[in-house]
Amino acid sequence: MAGAEYRFEKHLIVQQAEAERAMLNTFHQGEYTLEHPLVCHNLYLINPLSAVVAFRTEEAVAVTVTVFGKAKQGTISHTFPRAKEHILPVLGLYSGYKNQVEIREYRGRSVRLEIETPDVFDGKNPVYSMDTTPEYLQDQCIFLSPSANEVFAAFDYAGDARWCLTTPCVFDLKRLKNGNVLIGTNRLIRMPYYMSGLYEISLCGKIYREYRLPGGSHHDAIEQKDGNILCLTQDLTTETVEDMCVLIDRETGEILKSWDYKTFLQPGLGKSGSWSERDWFHNNAVWYDENTDS
């Protein structure tokens, strides 16, 4: 097209793989210890409130990572199993802050690190009000998901951001049985918010899998008991949207089964206030009832 400017951008999975490979090469070529670990802030490029710490110990030992809160109640810690080679995620860093992080061996030595993070929100406070208590929320966070170009973020009891994604992944986030999360991709295939499919990512932001769907994804997806995934979609070659669901093979990404709601529901019955012929159903959520297999 005359006058158009084209730019090639590597897929985020490729960018992350290159960054991880460079980190591992540095780690394996160096002598990193508990006292002098390798610290990689935002290793996977999309979560500036995370880091990865890598070091070796002479004996296999469990290690606890603690991110100290601005107040005692904001402290977050996690203990990792015994190993000699430790490549550990650091989650729960504050935005625009010199975070104090402790790495401690089980019944052994410890080191305190300072990890400085950028101001993800450019001086703005994204939370107007947080009505909870540290006794109730403890070290958990409340995750807020966008449907456009806002930041996907999680906030602690005090309303402080402790996790975010700076790439515009959208809609619901679901915790998977393996500890990763399922989230819509950042790759828009049609306005206003139909994405290429789903990512399985770690909370550090590492993408393990992308599930691409011909009709894209929107709003919601859930993991089944067998690990396969139910995801909301549509057929973009037709005149309607948000009126289909598919079952995705967790390992291969193959579509095992699809449901087109127009085959068993009559469009136009029970219209909502925002009803249109194109978006007649506007499916916002999906769930599975094991008792009725429906």
Locations of regions flagged by a protein language model:
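Short beta-strand segments within Ig-like beta-sandwich modules, predominantly Fibronectin type-III
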Residues: 77-83
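Extended, solvent-exposed segments with strong compositional bias
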Residues: 68-69, 79
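Short, solvent-exposed loop/linker segments at beta-strand-coil boundaries, enriched for Pro/Gly
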Residues: 71-73
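Histidine-/acidic-rich catalytic cores in large beta-rich domains
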Residues: 3-18, 25, 31-67, 86-87, ...
